[in-house]
Amino acid sequence: MITKRAVFIFSLWTGILFLGACQPDLYPGRNATRQTAELPVRKADLKYAKGFSITYYKTFKQVNVYNYEGKRIDTAQYLLIRRGGLIPDGFPNAQVIETPVRSIIGMSSMHVALIDFAEADGILTGLGNLKYASSVKVRKYIREGKIKEVGQETNLNNEMVLMMHPDVLMAVGNVSAKVNRFKLLTDAGIPVIQNSEYLESTPLGRAEWVKLMAALVDREELVDKKFDAIVLEYNKLVQLAKKAVVKPSVITTMPVKGTWYVPEGNSYLSHFLQDAGGSIKWADTKGIGTLPLSFELVSPEALKADFWLNIGYVNSKAEMTGRDSRFADFRPFKNGNVYNYNKKINDVGANDYWESGAVNPQIVLSDLIKILHPELLPQHQLVYYKQLK
């Protein structure tokens, strides 16, 4: 017997196949007279982010998202046109997005932060996992049923996304011309932006991705003003931290199954700690990620370190020694200098450090300076970090 669900799915996939056959009709204005090529007017002033660019033309915006390894063949291109506007010639491989975006599905808490920063939280209609969100407004929309859970990227509910048909889906990942995980969606006229902000090596570089969201929702002036204020405050704090006479040594994270992942010299965390006036071992390495090292290699540094930060999913020193009793021998453990970034975890387990903290690096930096050099910021109260007891 043919069920109603089977009929629905058959109809849905038939529609998708039909749309795929009529690909030129999917994008707004595609059948209208195409606009002749224009000369660029200006480029967005991106001082810190390396993973994308925005070029402004008279009637549209061109966004490029780059492969972090620098392979230009992997560049993803998007045309942001005014709703109902004509599509310019000369961009055969570009995905087209109508602006201002009125509906978006985000796949990570960072995407919630970008939307919130642009003060456009009402456009969020879907999340990969509803537990990701810390924003008070977004949690309210979730309770009201205005934001749907669409599944993780590895198990994305394509049927639901197709039915919702957002103006854009923001995914997580490095751009690659060889892999198109979202072909079904793009063939159905749903643009997918690969957001790789997590690959930026500096706190301000990661935060500057707010300008991509600004371009999508036509709020560049607002976002630029807010971001400029963050840059000013962040750089003031860096100069303040330079006044410290001593740079305390810092170890981070905990070993996982015998491997201790420590930040490389050009990584996001390494820049944060050095900007806060701390010193870390392996700061002279060139990578932007982590070094997988053995417990035996890291433990001599941990035995003599001044501070231990960014422990992971633990809330107390007892939890730490419950995982490995040897932690009790480390100097920062003995001296009470163990701090974790889990002060702002809500009732569903979302950690706001990864959300609002990502677009407010000046506050994270204030926390780190307060921990490492409390005399420099005597009035500051920790926002994202807490001392583990």
Language model regions located:
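Soluble non-cytosolic domains of exported or imported proteins
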Residues: 151-156, 172-179, 200-207, 221-228, ...
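Second-shell loop/turn segments in exported
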Residues: 94, 99-103, 113-114, 146-152, ...
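A short, structured surface patch at a secondary-structure boundary
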Residues: 64, 69-162, 168-174
